[in-house]
From Swiss-Prot:
GO annotations of cellular component type: mitochondrial inner membrane
Family: Belongs to the complex I 49 kDa subunit family.
Record-linked NCBIfam families: NuoD, PRK06075.1
Classification lineage: Eukaryota, Amoebozoa, Evosea, Eumycetozoa, Dictyostelia
EC number: 7.1.1.2
Name of encoding gene: nad7
Originating species: Dictyostelium citrinum
Location of this chain's protein in the cell: Mitochondrion inner membrane
GO BP: any one term: mitochondrial electron transport, NADH to ubiquinone
Superkingdom field: Eukaryota
Disulfide bridges in this chain: none
Membrane topology value: Peripheral membrane protein
Function: Core subunit of the mitochondrial membrane respiratory chain NADH dehydrogenase (Complex I) that is believed to belong to the minimal assembly required for catalysis. Complex I functions in the transfer of electrons from NADH to the respiratory chain. The immediate electron acceptor for the enzyme is believed to be ubiquinone.
Protein name: NADH-ubiquinone oxidoreductase 49 kDa subunit
Length: 406
């Protein structure tokens, strides 16, 4: 007689399958490594392993002057360079200007140029985020179309600073150089032309059946979960929460610009894609307004220690030449003080805690990167989805490991 119970005892219990996902190449969302636990094709657990791109940025900054530390911020989220320079420059300015008895304000022209290039950077980032996300899922054409436009934006970087990526253009006290001739007209032409290109990319993806199947209902995050995990940017606004630092805590006269905060209802991957696409339209509107607000004037504070002497005088006046050399070699002293500065980076809230101690170097610089907090939520977002959906979720988080690992 067949003993059924004995047969069942001999059957081994199936164990979950553990998969090493990555590390990926730095060009593919950074050096990301995941330990993925699977039950068949379904994700049970995702454990991110970080630190493969750790360079000790916060510690390195402690050994540099306030001016020498600026280029490190280009190399954090290397897709959103100018926005991070903007945050650091604001932090240094607030530390320094708070120590003075007189009230000083950054020149109006410098503020407008900062806003202009911060929004150009936002468009740069969202082009990268949306089109590489599409490429990860299998749609190659949007990537090829949009990167042709992205190249034009990189040329604007090059024309104002000489560098395509690591510009070090926004500096404490203002900006490094004034706008070159005819660049305003070229940026305006780009805005008009890119709106049409953006509509073409939308037509290709928004109602695409396969694209929607891969994104809709994937990685749903409730408003409560988004707040608990510390999500900001599109991952928070996708849950219907109206939070944008440019509106909630305006800096450099952002409150004088007319733009909308784009929010969603169902916070899934498709909603976040729509938000990023619509945010590009809002950035184009801000760029237009900034171009209209440009007036002749100074591009940096004058007569204060946090800005370098004008190069025009360096070749004519020995005192200016000496001061210029000492500014970059020895730096400037900031009295003991501390502050925390936040800006609305394309990926979310980018924050800098800066502590001064009566020397020319920061005592402590703590960097809060949005991607670090978003990556914590990847396990929550991936549960009960298929392995193929993990790729979609990495794309929807818009992770860059320069800022995560620091």
């Amino acid at each position: 007689m067949l003993n059924i119970s004995k047969i069942f005892e001999e059957v081994k219990v199936m164990k979950n399958f553990t998969l090493n996902f990555g590390p990926q190449h730095p060009a593919a969302h950074g050096v990301l490594r995941l330990i993925v636990e699977l039950e068949s094709e379904n994700v049970v657990r995702v454990e991110p392993h970080i630190g493969l791109l750790h360079r000790g940025t916060e510690k390195l900054i402690e050994g540099k002057t306030y001016t020498q530390a600026l280029p490190y911020f280009d190399r954090l989220d290397y897709v959103s360079m100018n926005v991070q320079e903007h945050a650091y420059s604001l932090a240094v300015e607030r530390l320094y200007l708070d120590s003075l008895d007189i009230e000083l304000e950054i020149p109006q022209r410098a503020k407008v140029i900062r806003v202009l290039f911060s929004e150009i950077t936002r468009v740069l980032n969202h082009i990268m985020a949306t089109t590489t996300h599409a490429m990860d899922v299998g749609a190659l054409t949007p990537f090829l179309w949009a990167f042709e436009e992205r190249e034009k934006l990189m040329e604007f970087y090059e024309r104002v600073s000489g560098a395509r990526m690591h510009a070090a253009y926004i500096r404490p006290g203002g900006v490094a150089f004034d706008l070159p001739m005819n660049i305003s007209e070229d940026i305006y032409k780009f805005v008009i032309q890119y709106r049409k290109r953006l509509e073409e990319i939308e037509d290709m993806l928004i109602n695409n059946r396969i694209w929607k199947q891969r994104l809709v209902d994937i990685g749903i995050v409730s408003a409560e979960e988004a707040l608990n995990y510390g999500f900001t940017g599109p991952l928070l606004r996708g849950a219907g929460i109206v939070y944008d630092i440019r509106k909630n805590y305006p800096y450099d006269d952002y409150d004088k610009y007319d733009f909308k905060i784009i929010i969603g209802e169902e916070n899934n991957s498709y909603t976040r894609f729509i938000i990023r696409m619509k945010e590009m339209y809002q950035s184009l509107a801000i760029i237009e307004q900034a171009l209209n607000n440009l007036r002749p004037g100074l591009i940096k504070l004058e007569g204060v220690n946090i800005t370098a002497p004008d190069r025009a005088f360096v070749k004519k006046d020995m005192e200016s030449c000496i001061n210029h050399f000492k500014f970059f070699s020895e730096g400037f002293i900031i009295p003991a003080n501390e502050n925390y500065t936040i800006v609305e980076a394309p990926k979310g809230e980018f924050g800098i805690y800066l502590n001064a101690n009566d020397t020319a170097k920061p005592y402590r610089c703590r960097i809060k990167a949005p991607g670090f907090l978003h990556l914590q939520g990847l396990n929550m977002m991936s549960k009960d989805h298929l392995l193929a959906d993990v790729v979609t979720l990495i794309g929807t988080q818009d992770i860059v490991f320069g800022e995560v690992d620091r």
